[in-house]
């Protein structure tokens, strides 16, 4: 096992002579990763374009075909790296409160409900909930707001309690900019692909019961009670996000269908920046078998095209969770004979790139299997989270306890990890406050 320098019982630093920045492991000795993970992180840490340090969470682990482990945060002042993030922009989770409790939710009703959910929340399906082509374009451009109007969504707080209000695309990006970065053909595919949970990536829909509360004052602010049932959902942007990502990364396409769809999309790519994309395609070929990471200068035309594709396709992650929630809403009504209250506490991505201010610098933060956990000051524009800090939830792993907490203090460059979830029928939720505070100490700039 490579040697690490212990900062405290839950923080360890790893850096070899060849590395430009260190890796900070947010973990104890018992949870340090395997050699392959260390090797990947060492290779990444050699890149001179990185900023400060690489943060690696307690569940950091390699995935086949990926150059960067899941459970990492990587930062650069100048560059965007498509191989740092998995090809699933805005894979994420949403936490849904309900008005269900033991008085109105029996074991028989749970069985009846899950039989219904198997039909309306599929893990595998060729066609999900079909939407109009223009709505697919509007989702990419404007986020979930037009979709919620189309669905006539009954879920409370769905827009305001989605991270970034359910839209990663900046206001200055036009529809034409999106068509210059993503082939229109992909939108014709994407309009059929919402409402599918997905079988890859440990995607799930869990029903959970709150069994313990550690801070009643905070729990009351979040409208959480002992005995209350909630849903936790994990899924991403689906095939649309994959196709848009594969256009800009040297990562090997895992299936023949991905290669075929990418070929069709790029062959009939009606972009005003075709020459720029040709340059990108040439770079991708050069980095196909390289140990180095392909990086786009963020201010270049290539970087702007990649970022637009990433952000626009990421909106399909918010949209997929919104459609699945609508399907859940209708299923609950059929089973219970009434409208069951669904109230979104938070929807948060864990695969995304975003410009943020850390250590007084504007930097590009790449989160791969990790979430942001901003304190009240950074959440100052939200009516509730400006008081509590950003909500964070760690899901169950095959019926182990799950945890919910919030970031009560400001921390520099200290995002939290997503655990390794699995499908489970009924789990138990505990409410913890500041349970991770020892894991997120500010770190000095390298």
Question: What is the meaning of each model-derived region?
Answer:
Residues 2-43, 49-56, 62-70, 74, ...:
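Domain-length cofactor-binding catalytic modules of enzymes
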Residues 93-96:
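A short, polar/proline- and glycine-enriched secondary-structure boundary/capping micro-motif
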């Amino acid at each position: 096992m490579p040697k690490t320098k212990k900062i405290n019982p839950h923080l360890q630093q790893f850096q070899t002579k060849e590395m430009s920045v260190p890796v900070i492991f947010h973990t104890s000795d018992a949870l340090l990763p395997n050699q392959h993970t260390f090797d990947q992180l060492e290779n990444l840490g050699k890149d001179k374009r990185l900023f400060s340090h690489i943060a690696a969470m307690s569940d950091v682990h390699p995935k086949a075909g990926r150059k960067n482990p899941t459970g990492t945060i990587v930062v650069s002042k100048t560059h965007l790296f498509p191989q740092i993030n998995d090809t699933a922009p805005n894979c994420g989770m949403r936490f849904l409160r309900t008005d269900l409790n033991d008085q109105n939710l029996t074991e028989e009703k749970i069985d009846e409900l899950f039989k219904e959910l198997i039909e309306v929340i599929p893990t595998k399906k060729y066609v999900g909930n079909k939407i109009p082509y223009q709505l697919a374009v509007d989702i990419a451009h404007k986020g979930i707001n037009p979709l919620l109007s189309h669905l006539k969504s009954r879920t409370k707080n769905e827009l305001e309690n989605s991270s970034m209000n359910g839209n990663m695309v900046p206001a200055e990006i036009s529809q034409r900019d999106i068509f210059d970065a993503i082939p229109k053909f992909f939108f014709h595919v994407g309009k059929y692909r919402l409402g599918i949970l997905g079988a890859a990536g440990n995607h799930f829909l869990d029903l959970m019961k709150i069994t313990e509360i550690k801070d009643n004052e905070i729990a009351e602010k979040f409208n959480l009670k002992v005995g209350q049932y909630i849903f936790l959902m994990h899924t991403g942007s689906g095939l649309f996000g994959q196709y848009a990502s594969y256009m800009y990364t040297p990562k090997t396409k895992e299936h023949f269908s991905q290669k075929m769809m990418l070929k069709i999309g790029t062959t009939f790519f009606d972009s005003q920046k075709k020459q720029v994309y040709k340059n990108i395609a040439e770079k991708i070929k050069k980095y196909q078998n390289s140990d180095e990471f392909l990086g786009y200068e963020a201010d270049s035309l290539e970087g702007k095209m990649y970022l637009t594709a990433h952000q626009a396709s990421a909106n399909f992650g918010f949209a997929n969770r919104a459609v699945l929630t609508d399907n859940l809403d209708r299923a609950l009504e059929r089973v219970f004979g009434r409208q069951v209250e669904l109230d979104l506490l938070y929807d948060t991505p864990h695969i995304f790139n975003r410009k943020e201010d850390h250590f007084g610098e504007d930097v590009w933060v790449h989160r791969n299997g990790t979430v942001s956990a901003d304190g009240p000051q950074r959440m100052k524009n939200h009516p509730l989270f400006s008081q509590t800090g950003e909500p964070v939830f760690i899901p169950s792993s095959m019926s182990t306890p799950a945890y919910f907490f919030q970031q009560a203090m400001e921390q520099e460059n200290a995002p939290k990890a997503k655990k390794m979830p699995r499908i489970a029928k009924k789990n138990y939720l505990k409410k913890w406050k500041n349970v991770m505070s020892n894991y997120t100490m500010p770190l000095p700039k390298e």
